[in-house]
Amino acid sequence: MKFGSLLGLSLVGLSVASPVTNVWKSPRAADDFIRGVNLGGWLVLEPWITPGIFEEGGDSAVDEWTLSAALGHRAHERLKLHWNTFMEQKDFDRIKGAGLTHVRIPIGYWAVAPIQGEPFVQGQVDMLDAAIDWARHSGLKVNVDLHGAPGSQNGFDNSGRLGPANWQKGDTVAQTYKALDVLIQRYAKKDGVVDEINLINEPFPQAGIQVEPLKDYYRQGAAKVKSANPNVAVVISDAFMGPSKWNGFDVGAKTIIDTHHYQVFSPQLVAMDINQHVKAACDFGNDELAKSSIPAIVGEWCGALTDCTQYLNGRHEGARYDGTHKDSDPKTAVPNGCVRKTGGSASQLTDEEKTNTRRYIEAQLDSFSKGHGWFWWTWKTERGSPGWDLNDLLSNGLFPQPLDSRMFLGQCN
């Protein structure tokens, strides 16, 4: 969960839509349209989602690797407590009750194919097994997402290890196939529940990942999934290039391309006003999703208009919005702008902030109808995170219920 799409970010404003309660009709109302949510921070840990666990590990704990090392012999017991309590059947029931169809469950290679000498602990697959049972009981389908690869495919903390992207070096790709093989053998034949297997999350060419070897990995990974169960979709990442850049790429299997859309991970993005955020969201659907020859899903997105959530940019990083991040632009930063926004509930937002959040969410829902579906990031957080915590947004009426209800109709027309 980093960077996201920087496409279509024209700074031309829109007029504000008049608030009306109405029903919006998707141009793609097919039964296979995905409306899902990520279970982030559960089986792959992230500091901003569960800050308390990382704080227990001290200042050195900035990702799951360093957290596990810092906790030492206590790591397995502490993480097992988290795995066993963070998500339950009642969460899946509430997700289904909100009109969603899928959950995307991130998991790291270390959970299924640990490498000797690394500090990670295991036990996550027991809860992934439980999650599939919960999904079956609730009537949800599952996207199993290989979120962290050996060496790190992007250098982000959510890959398991913050730092250089060393995937594709040494034996890391071969080690990734071992992890993928376990996931496929264990889950690809869960017909009716496991709907997709995501081969790798957010490989990042700008960090040194080579695209041609990535394509080879996609082809071989897709062949493995297809051999196990041709009905399970293979999900490939657009690698921050935009889905239309992959037009014509064929892995020889039922394929979905995954793109992520965030508008908070640069000074230019957090400086935009609500009209510009809405326009950027609408442009993304028209410029990328509608032009993709491969069925495209927005595998991660949110309603955040700032990067203020504590640790969102990293364990010891500030925010661009208020000027406390090293990459901030002092010309556009808002001093003290993150007051009331670092955590807690969306209920504490001002009326204007609530309206803007709802409007931005609706625009994205409308825009993403140009694709094959979406997965919101993320279902819940430990301390709350306005704009990210879907469970909280639902409770505060900032996420449409039912999903096709609109207060701001026709924003992307």
UniProtKB/Swiss-Prot annotation:
GO terms for molecular function: glucan exo-1,3-beta-glucosidase activity; transferase activity. It catalyses: Successive hydrolysis of beta-D-glucose units from the non-reducing ends of (1->3)-beta-D-glucans, releasing alpha-glucose. Its EC number is 2.4.1.-, 3.2.1.58. Disulfide bonds join 282-412. GO terms for cellular component: cell surface; extracellular region. It is found in: Secreted; Secreted, Cell wall. The active site is at 202 (proton donor), 300 (nucleophile). Monomer. This is Probable glucan 1,3-beta-glucosidase ARB_04467. The lineage of its organism: Eukaryota, Fungi, Dikarya, Ascomycota, Pezizomycotina.
